[in-house]
Regions:
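A charged N-terminal "starter" segment
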Residues: 1-129, 143-144, 395, 403-406, ...
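Active-site loop/helix belt of alpha/beta enzymes
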Residues: 2-5, 143, 153-292
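Conserved, mostly hydrophobic/aromatic
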Residues: 40, 61, 72, 83, ...
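Alpha-helical scaffolding segments of alpha/beta enzyme cores, especially the outer helices
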Residues: 42, 46-49, 67, 71-74, ...
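Structural preference for beta-strand elements that scaffold enzyme active sites
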Residues: 55-57, 78, 97-101, 124-126, ...
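A cross-domain feature marking catalytic cores of carbohydrate-active enzymes
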Residues: 58-62, 81, 104, 129-131, ...
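Active-site-adjacent beta->alpha loops and helix N-cap segments on the catalytic face
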Residues: 133-146
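Charged (often Lys/Glu-rich) extended helix/loop segments that serve as interaction or gating elements
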Residues: 269-415
Length: 415
């Protein structure tokens, strides 16, 4: 039986079974994504327990793997999607289209076509838009069903400027325009909610700013209700983080739940949330093999077979991911820089990081790879994407096979 709300609030690399990781690497090769589905369930249940009266959806963008979606659907989660591909993947995994929420951000025509057609057959689908223009485009397609307005409260929080969504961001209707837009939208659609998402990677020290944003959005919801009538829900998005650094404490979810509900205040609308990173980040790691040790003038450089094509976040966001020597965690630590085989100086996972002294053929683990890990993986340098193996108790299964060179070129045609 799974642990639930009382499961450990954080999973460090040292908590993984190193012998099992070594066996997985030997059997399936490296680089390798290893996903723990029991941990996915634990994280979702812990989050949902902190918001017992709320509608808790999973933000599919964090990890759209079928194994993840099926696992979360099995414990009662609904799915929030940000693109037609995510809608299709959720449906393929068994989601009822009437329970889905589609959040449209500058949506391509094909995405709006798909969503409008889906809504014509499934009246429970909710489409969220953050631009008046998007509502016009939906109306042009004959859609008049359930919609929510994404608002921009003018406050952004998060672990990096590229994920904070403040007043000048591309997301949402500016606060001062919301009531006017709501009146127009309510005349043409079934307006059921207000939506906001103001950042990512929010930890305990960020709660004050995050709650100020929630207070602002809740105030806008009350303004809208005075203008057009009751709303069904107020969706405050996700953004709840996990500790990537070993000395960072995890969120105290009971406190988070209390703070968020207090910030939202008295509402007739149901509170809704969309955790993504919180659910999957520490449920997955990457195994990578050391292939090169080089003594540079100012550092020891450790070359591995994973790269920014395997995990983009360090290059894209300067993100910190914990790294551990699985082969010999007890060796004396020394500062090393770990990088992959790509021909760019951005292909570095850490610089001068103390790690148990790596040797060639050692197995390293890169932690917290479950959120925006495989989602951002690419075929840069024509590298096949890695396999993904899921574990669940004693069961192990390949849920994404390792790509081959034929997979890299299969879509190409002669000129």
């Amino acid at each position: 039986m799974d642990a639930s709300a009382d499961s450990p609030p954080v999973r460090r690399l040292a908590d993984w079974e190193h012998d099992r990781l070594g066996a997985l690497a030997d059997r399936y090769g490296t680089p390798l994504y290893v996903l723990d589905l029991a941990r996915v369930r634990e994280n979702y249940r812990r989050f949902a327990a902190a918001f017992p009266d709320a509608h808790v959806m999973y933000a599919a963008k964090a990890h759209t793997g079928r194994a993840v979606l099926e696992t979360l659907l099995s414990v009662g989660a609904d799915i929030e999607c940000a693109a037609r591909g995510e809608l299709q993947r959720a449906i393929d995994a068994g989601a009822d289209p009437d329970t889905l929420q589609y959040t449209a951000v500058n949506p391509p025509a094909a995405d709006l076509d798909y969503a409008a057609d889906l809504g014509a057959d499934h009246s429970g689908l909710t489409i969220t838009a953050g631009a008046r223009d998007t509502f016009d485009r939906l109306a042009d397609r004959g859609y008049d069903g359930r919609v929510a307005i994404r608002v921009n409260p003018g406050i952004g929080t998060g672990h990096h400027e590229k994920v904070a969504t403040g007043k000048d961001a591309k997301f949402g209707i500016p606060a001062e325009q919301v009531t006017d837009v709501a009146a127009d939208v309510a005349d043409r659609f079934e307006l059921v909610g207000l939506h906001s998402h103001v950042g990512s990677g929010v930890l305990q020290d960020d709660l004050d700013d995050h709650c100020r944003a929630i207070e602002r959005v809740a105030g806008l919801a009350r303004d809208v209700e005075r203008e057009v009538g009751d709303l069904e829900f107020l969706d405050i998005g996700g953004g709840f983080g996990v500790p990537y650094r070993e000395d960072e404490p995890p969120l105290e979810m009971e406190v988070v739940g209390e703070r968020v509900r207090a910030a939202a205040g008295e509402l007739g609308a149901q509170l809704a949330l969309e955790p993504g990173r919180y659910v999957v980040a520490d449920a997955e790691l990457i195994l990578t093999r050391v292939n090169t040790i080089k003594q540079a003038p100012s550092a020891t450089v450790v070359g591995v077979d994973a790269s920014l094509a395997t995990l983009l976040r360090p290059a894209m966001f300067e993100a910190y991911h914990p790294i551990r020597n699985v082969t010999a965690p007890g060796r004396k630590s020394e500062p090393v820089s770990v990088g992959g085989p790509c021909c760019t100086s951005a292909d570095v996972f850490c610089t001068d990081r103390p790690i148990a002294r790596p040797e060639r053929e050692d197995l390293l683990a890169i932690g917290n790879a479950g959120a925006y890990g495989y989602e951002l993986a690419s075929q840069f340098h024509s590298q096949p994407r890695p396999a993904e193996v899921a574990v669940d108790g004693g069961k192990t299964s390949v849920v994404r096979r390792r790509e081959t060179l034929d997979d890299v070129t299969h879509g190409e045609q002669e000129f």
